[in-house]
Structure formats: C-alpha cells, structure tokens
Amino acid sequence: MPVIAIIGAGPGLGAAVARRFGREGFSIALISRNQSKLDDMVAQLSAVGVTSRGYSADVRVPAELEDALARAAAELGPITTLQYSPLPSRDYLKPVLEMTAELALEALQFSALGLIHAVRAVLPAMQEARSGSIILINGGTSVKARAGFAGTSIAFPAESAYGEMLHDVLEDQGIRVGQLVIPGGIPQLRLPHGIDDVADRIWYLHTNAGPFRTLLIPLEDGRE
C-alpha cells in the first residue's frame, strides 16, 4: 500500500489531502507538533475508512523529524509521497526592518532545512523503487518577496530553490517533484469546492509530471 507523509498536517489542508489520497488507497502518516490534534485527525480519518497514524515532531529539530519519518516507514511502509507543508509561525511574518538574523535563521530551519532533512530521510527508498513524489506547499512570497513578510520572503525562496533542483535531478529517476504556490489564505480564494479543490490539485501534481511550479491562482489575485 502506498504511503503519503504529510508534514505540517492540520485539520484544514492536511486533512483534505489525507482524505483525497486515502480514497486512492494510500495510508497516511500525519506529522506535526501536537500529538493530541494528530490523534483527533486519525480518529476522523478512520471514521471515513482511511488508514492513518500520527507522529509528533518539530521540523526545526532534525532528530525529531527523522525519527517520525522512520517510525512511519516502519509501521506503514516506505514513504512513496512526501508533502512538505508546515504552516509558518506568525513570528516569521515580520516587516523587514524588524527581521533579525536569529529569526531569519529560524525561518530557514523551518522551511528550507526542514525540507532537506525530510527529503534525505525518504529519498533512498524512492530511488530504490524508481518511483515517488515530493510536493512543496508554499505561499506567494516563494515567488515574490514582500517587505511585510520578511521571514517567509527569505525562507520560501531557499526552499523553492532546493525543490527545483530536486525536480531537475530526479525526473529521470521516476520521482516527481513539484511546488504548489497558494497566494493568500485558502478560505479567501473562493474556490468552487473550497479546500477539496486544493487537495485535488495536489493529487494531480502527484500523478502527473510537469514543471516544478504551479500557481493555484494568479499571484496578483492573492494576498501573500
């Protein structure tokens, strides 16, 4: 049974993606900091027939993240799809003149370095199988910097650069790497089917080869 690991799993997009992939026969590894909330999500997914387990980890702590992914692989099977979508702290959304080096480093640890640790944990199994997908979820500051959102304007482009390089190197190995850019909060986008439309787009990125970056909506239509 294929397995998707959703890093940054929450009751919104993470749960929607879990349901979407669960309908396709995936087991779901839910990873975030709050074990209690993960347990609630596991119960809700079980009620609709989706197999899932929750693993608490802070993406800024490499040992925690690597341990969570290792336990998921041991209990559910090799990770075939990795979704990296932790929601940045509002501390990272400071104006540029308030940005400190320490906060910038933390934002980079949260986004770019966390992704690198996660990829290095799951990639060997994907390479051995010559199959898999890695999907990044980012806001609009991954494409265009905004002075009012300095942390993500620094960290998201670094995460994006790493992802794009992976896309170019791994496409010949049967591993798809893509980024979905969501400019603004999902409720404000007024999608016909709401968050389920976003989950459908992520499923499409998993199943179809293509360019690295996909914009959910044109950047100028979003907030961030």
Where on the chain are the PLM-derived regions?
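Conserved glycine-rich cofactor-binding loop
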Residues: 10-11
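Conserved glycine-rich Rossmann-like NAD(P)H-binding loop of the short-chain dehydrogenase/reductase
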Residues: 25-39
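Rossmann-fold cofactor-recognition segment
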Residues: 45-63
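Active-site Tyr-X3-Lys motif and surrounding loop/helix of classical short-chain dehydrogenase/reductase
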Residues: 67-74, 94-98, 102-109
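Active-site loop of short-chain dehydrogenase/reductase
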Residues: 78-79, 126-139, 174-175
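Catalytic loop of short-chain dehydrogenase/reductase
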Residues: 88, 101-103, 107, 111-114, ...
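Amphipathic alpha-helical dimer-interface segment in Rossmann-like NAD(P)H-dependent oxidoreductases
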Residues: 110-128
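C-terminal helical subdomain
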Residues: 172-224
